[in-house]
Regions:
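Conserved beta/loop motifs at nucleotide-recognition and modification sites
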Residues: 1-202
Length: 202
């Protein structure tokens, strides 16, 4: 199956991946779909190419897992932006710093601007969650544009981040986005990541 280089909104990519594989009678764990979308971006031809390779790898198992992604595409299942937002959401300082330390050591594969963008989308969704009166999985999934699989996680995290705290986090992300571009600071990757996590979790 061949696609042109059409691009879609990044938050729609995991669903596109699931549907593409479903057409081949292959399922994918939601976390694995997120890992792929984070790593490959939103270029559908590029994504389709990698998924066609995975079709050969999974064989008769017919399921793509984070482990398969890690082994065959080279994305760490433990050190990625999905795991970082999860660690931050759960206020797991140790795990968050472990992940950004890995990012800083491999900053070409983990550009700071991508982490900022993903965290901004994550906290924007958490802000939206606070405005949703119907907290049923279906309603939250639709309002946030996330797989129902992740709804309970968002609801749990929202208790750690009330609206006022989220507003502060979003402002912090804007500040460090500017700093990463040399505005008001000239910090290396490690310092940027460490300062960012400190200011989000303080």
């Amino acid at each position: 199956m061949i696609f042109d280089s059409k691009k879609i909104y990044e938050d729609k990519v995991p669903s596109w991946i699931q549907n593409f594989l479903k057409s081949k009678q292959i399922t994918i764990i939601p976390k694995a779909a997120l890992m792929l979308s984070e790593f490959l971006g939103n270029d559908l031809s590029k994504i389709a190419n990698e998924l066609n390779k995975l079709e050969i790898v999974v064989g008769s198992d017919k399921q793509v897992t984070p482990e398969i992604i890690e082994e065959n595409i080279g994305i760490s299942k433990d050190f990625n932006n999905f795991e970082l937002q999860k660690a931050i959401g759960n206020l797991d300082h140790k795990k968050a710093y472990q992940i950004v330390n890995y990012f800083a050591q491999n900053h070409k594969q983990h550009p700071f601007v991508l982490t900022i963008s993903i965290l901004y989308m994550y906290f924007t969704k958490l802000m939206t969650l606070h405005t949703v009166s119907d907290k049923s999985p279906a309603a939250v999934s639709k309002a946030l544009g996330v797989n129902p699989y992740f709804v309970s996680e968002y609801i749990t995290v929202s208790k750690n981040f009330p609206m006022k705290r989220i507003s502060g986090v979003l402002e912090t992300l804007r500040v460090y986005d500017s700093k990463s571009k040399g505005v008001g600071a000239n910090l290396g990757p490690r310092d940027l990541y460490y300062e960012l996590i400190y200011n989000i979790l303080k």
